[in-house]
Amino acid sequence: MSRHKWLKPLIGAAAGVLIITLMLPSRDHRHTPQPEYAAKMVPQQEKQLKKGMLALDLSATDTITRMDARQDIEYVMRELNGKTNDQKKHFVRKLQQSHSHLHTLQWINTRQGKSTTYTGSKAQPRLLNHVQVKNSLDAARRSVLQNKSYESAAFQVEGRKYFVMAEPATDGTYGVAALVSQQVLHDVEKHQRKNLRLIPYPKEGSYKIESVHPDTLHDITVKTGHDNENASHYFENEIVVRFRQNPDQQQLREIAADLNCEPGRKLGYTYVFHSNNMSFKELQQYFSQKWNPVYAEPHYMYLTNKKTPVKASDVSIPNDLLFSRYQWNLPATETNRGWALSKGSKNVVVAVVDTGVDMDHPDLKGQILPGHNVVNPKEKPYDDVGHGTHVAGIISALVNNGEGVAGMTWYNKVMPVKVLDQSGSGTTYSVAEGIIWAADHGAKVINLSLGNYAQAEFLHDAIKYAYDKDVVLVAATGNDNTERPGYPAAYPEVFAVSATDASMHRASFSNYGDYVDVMAPGASIASTYPGNQYAALSGTSMASPHVSALAALVRSINPDLTNKEVMDLMRNSVIDLGTPGHDKYFGYGQIDVYKALKAAQRPYVPLQLYPQHLGDKIKSLLKMLET
């Protein structure tokens, strides 16, 4: 009994210390000198920084392509050894259907000094007769005969890049040479010039698009990529309307007649009308005067934006080909350590609302759900840009399968929702419909690597709908190095993500501001790309899926957490960067997967309620001691 008496004051004192300690910041703070990207740069300075980032992406993608090609050649050697010529033809034909970049393969018999060439049905005979191609293939053949590897520099033929690579078998009796297309470099450059806003995008005049200042809706002209910083884009003959009371069929016919248009497209409580001859301003005046709606706003276009110590044996080092050399982003976010706590769950689905996904990519096999195509509902949500496939790979590429890249989660499934077309852009309507569809079909996390600088109530309604269904919404802030809030990232229901580089500096292109929640890696991130290929891309589009993957891991290890609790937990388990605490350049800091999952293992109580929660626990303990 006497022991209980002296335990009570001891517990009380300990409680006081604990409460004081818990009120102090618990984040790991790392102060590293940060480049002054926030200082207003002239357009030429910003352009040069972005060009440098693009060059890094292209260089990394070039090396990734070569590493992947070498692995393909080794696979071909294993599969074709001992096969007949007909079997080899059949194998190569089938391989080239899924690996179209492997333009030509040569089987080299070193004992006989002979080689046999296999090309796909789409091969161009004149390409093989080109001097550079012939010389490179001859050099590759000579190297194999000498039991040496071969790799040519890149060269251009008719505006397309190629290289030749060859490998001898370990016993020196045969080898394989390949002519490899590097069309992926052209695709990456084209996409990243848009994604990093190095060019005016989208071009005015395409699809009758207007550019306006997001605050005033006054017309502005976008001549350079830098001009996108203060621009939003909308369809000049369309309007989004939310009525105070939904119109009946007769009223819709009346509106259609007044506007010279088809009946409006309806999504939730909102309608989109497209007029054949009226501008947005005329449409806005018509609805404001005649219908007194809740809102009548432009139909905006959205664009892509890509401790308890753990034992050494618990740190997972996957065998994926590109992991050790190119996936700096996973160790930087403590993802490997986090896998010791959770590798995810197939029951927690991440929707990628984007350009679609390459559903046939071998490094995404079994990870992709059927999804939905908003752009063309009759078709599957296949990716015709590359952006969505790259985002999906960051989240859920197969881990430890010996090829390509490792995703952040092992078991979480990706639900592709295609809302952006082949140009990488989409409408408010398509993005909103995609969000609602994902929320209605079981997504627990929605990734939005897209944005615009104008608020759209229509889109906000869709965001609130998903949030009210307990979905964690994660969005990229944008790539214009501006403090201007980007949407949907700046909506209060959305978790906003900006980008860091490998040095934990804010990436030179990354947007910033008081609305930013956290940072995640976004510079030269290696991931999956259409056509069974891989690419390194930069952008807050690449940072956002890191956080979506973390949210999925958190919800996998603790399914009882609400979306708000998941978001609070991620904010409070970061590597603090810059000024201690929250700041506009780094938000709360860079995500720490291990720390977040460690926190999620425990029953989660929001920090502001923790003193009360702790007090209740202590009262319970004291009561138990009194019995």
Where do the PLM segments sit?
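Autoinhibitory propeptides
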Residues: 2-4, 212-230, 253-325, 627
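Juxtamembrane extracytoplasmic/periplasmic/luminal helical "stalk" adjacent to the first N-terminal
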Residues: 26-86
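Protease zymogen maturation seam
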Residues: 62-66, 232-236, 290-349, 362-363, ...
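Conserved beta-strands of PAS-like sensory domains
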Residues: 160-201
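Active-site core segment of subtilase-fold serine proteases
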Residues: 310-413, 434, 579
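Substrate-binding/access-modulating region of protease and related hydrolase catalytic domains
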Residues: 345, 419-493, 503-506, 530-538, ...
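Catalytic-core environment of secreted peptidases
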Residues: 362-364, 369, 406-408, 499-541, ...
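Hydrolase catalytic cores
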Residues: 392-395, 419-420, 444-445, 449, ...
